[in-house]
């Protein structure tokens, strides 16, 4: 059974629970629930759990270091489990993708995302798979404030569809591979009827 480390990026604590920056945590929680795993064990400067899905052993990690230091947590987990970077899937929010869409890719720059910046720095490279959950850009105002505010009421009404669609993407990634998943999901509106 192959092993994958799946990381959801976010900020710890109830204050950040429903913020846009916590989209990675939300998807990871949805995945854990779907596979009957519990992500509660304190380990690797985060909370950790394990489960299996489609013949893969999944190590689930939510760094508790705050976004800007997420790389430390992920590096600890990879070292302990002796996993290569290519067996890591990182789920994070993305300002450059509209709400309701997700994209998946391997490698690339951090695009100004401090969590990704920390990962690339601590891991010594960017050769991990990224599941980019669209949160859109603010019409007015500061990006930092925007990512740390809760989803709007309209977005909250559609959030379950976005999370379920992202879970479908993860399932495709594990069963069909990256190229097929990219072609299926990278331009798909998950909120379309």
Swiss-Prot record:
Keyword list (alphabetical) reads: Cytoplasm, Hydrolase, RNA-binding, tRNA-binding
Q: What is its EC number?
A: 3.1.1.29
Q: Which parts of the sequence bind tRNA? A: 16, 66, 68, 114
UniProt site (Discriminates between blocked and unblocked aminoacyl-tRNA): 11
The catalytic activity, as recorded, is:
an N-acyl-L-alpha-aminoacyl-tRNA + H2O = an N-acyl-L-amino acid + a tRNA + H(+)
Q: Provide any one GO MF term from the record.
A: tRNA binding
Q: What biological-process terms (Gene Ontology) are attached?
A: protein quality control for misfolded or incompletely synthesized proteins; rescue of stalled ribosome
Q: Could you identify this protein by its name?
A: Peptidyl-tRNA hydrolase
Sorted alphabetically, the Gene Ontology cellular component annotations on this record are:
cytoplasm
Q: Where is this site: Stabilizes the basic form of H active site to accept a proton?
A: 93
Cellular compartment(s): Cytoplasm
Q: Which HAMAP family match?
A: Pept_tRNA_hydro_bact
Subunit comment = Monomer.
* Record's function text: Hydrolyzes ribosome-free peptidyl-tRNAs (with 1 or more amino acids incorporated), which drop off the ribosome during protein synthesis, or as a result of ribosome stalling. Catalyzes the release of premature peptidyl moieties from peptidyl-tRNA molecules trapped in stalled 50S ribosomal subunits, and thus maintains levels of free tRNAs and 50S ribosomes.
Organism superkingdom: Bacteria
Provide the primary localization: cytoplasm
- Source organism per UniProt: Geobacter sulfurreducens (strain ATCC 51573 / DSM 12127 / PCA)
What family is reported? Belongs to the PTH family.
Question: What gene does the UniProt entry assign to this protein?
Answer: pth
Q: Which PROSITE patterns match?
A: PEPT_TRNA_HYDROL_1, PEPT_TRNA_HYDROL_2
């Amino acid at each position: 059974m192959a092993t994958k480390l799946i990381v959801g990026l976010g900020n710890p604590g109830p204050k950040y629970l429903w913020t846009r920056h916590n989209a990675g945590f939300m998807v990871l929680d949805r995945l854990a629930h779907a596979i009957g795993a519990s992500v509660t064990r304190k380990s690797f400067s985060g909370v950790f759990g394990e489960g299996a899905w489609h013949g893969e052993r999944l190590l689930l990690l939510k760094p508790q270091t705050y976004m800007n230091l997420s790389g430390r947590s992920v590096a600890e987990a990879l070292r302990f489990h002796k996993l290569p970077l290519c067996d890591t899937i990182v789920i994070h929010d993305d300002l450059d993708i509209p709400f309701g869409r997700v994209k998946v890719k391997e490698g690339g720059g951090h695009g100004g995302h401090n969590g990704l910046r920390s990962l690339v720095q601590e891991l010594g490279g960017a050769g991990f798979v990224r599941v980019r959950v669209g949160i859109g850009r603010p019409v007015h105002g500061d990006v930092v404030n925007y990512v740390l505010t809760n989803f709007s009421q309209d977005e909250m009404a559609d959030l379950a569809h976005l999370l379920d669609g992202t879970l479908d993407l993860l399932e495709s990634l594990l069963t069909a591979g990256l190229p097929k998943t990219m072609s299926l999901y990278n331009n798909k509106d998950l909120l379309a009827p």
